[in-house]
From Swiss-Prot:
Xref: NCBIfam families: encap_f1
Pfam family, any one: Linocin_M18
UniProt-annotated location(s): Encapsulin nanocompartment
Chief subcellular location: other
Temperature sensitivity of activity: Stable as a monodisperse organelle up to 50 degrees Celsius, at higher temperatures they aggregate.
The protein's name: Type 1 encapsulin shell protein
InterPro entries: ENCAP, Encapsulin_nc
GO cellular component: encapsulin nanocompartment
Biotech and industrial use: Foreign proteins can be targeted to ectopic nanocompartments in E.coli upon coexpression with a construct using the 38 C-terminal residues of DypB (AC C0ZVK5), tested with GFP and luciferase. Probably only one molecule of each foreign protein is inside the nanocompartment due to its small interior space.
Keywords: Encapsulin nanocompartment
Species name: Rhodococcus erythropolis (strain PR4 / NBRC 100887)
Gene: enc
TM region positions: none
Domain of life: Bacteria
Subunit structure: Forms hollow shells composed of 60 subunits. Monomers probably form pentamers which assemble into the shell. There are 12 pores where the pentamers meet as well as 3-fold axis channels and dimer channels; none are larger than 3-4 Angstroms in diameter. The N-terminus of the protein is inside the shell, the C-terminus is outside.
Amino acid sequence: MTNLHRDLAPISAAAWAEIEEEASRTFKRHVAGRRVVDVEGPSGDDLAAIPLGHQVPINPLADGVIAHARQSQPVIELRVPFTVSRQAIDDVERGAKDSDWQPVKDAAKQIAFAEDRAIFEGYPAASITGVRASGSNPELKLPIDAKDYPEAISQAITSLRLAGVNGPYSLLLNADAFTAINETSDHGYPIREHLRRVLDGEIIWAPAIDGAFLLSTRGGDYELHLGQDLSIGYLSHDANSVELYFQESMTFLMYTSEAVVSLA
């Protein structure tokens, strides 16, 4: 038995398989950060902190003794509870192919958003600064009209190149901006294709973020550290429902402030 206590859940292997498949599909669809940053791990449930390689002086224990404290980044645990009906679970054993897993999808989306918000917008309580606040390049304005996106992205690419940051460069767009580039054309040519001509990386739907980010994906500039990768655990059950939860442990570090341009 692990700390997830799944063995205690009144859920068959077939139902677990459906829940996990739906969870994985939904999480991967909504999460964006893992597609552009280096992912380290999962390193195990016991990962508590990431050493930063720096130290700071502290008050000595006695005269003539020099003391330093080594710095580290704490790993945080994210958890999102959700409830599924026992009827949906039992229907799988009866051969149903359409059990209602909407609570699974809603919770998977919620934890995907939480992870991406921590990466891109930061999480001060967890000592995570985030990509936006860590970036040293001037923030650019994301145009109101999608027809002006290619020019803005070209400016962002120029900023990265002038800062000595090589590509490939990937573009993350919030849901509205992503929809706009797919629905807008300029002289009959889709804006998405205009952007593909100036980018050598991916154009990624990132519904959790505000605005957009252009990032280098050359590697080595930012790291998402995972202790426990996204997992499903068991909390309790009654005659009608089973309470489960998504859980992961993570932290995020950015090493190269020049490797990103944010657009808002």
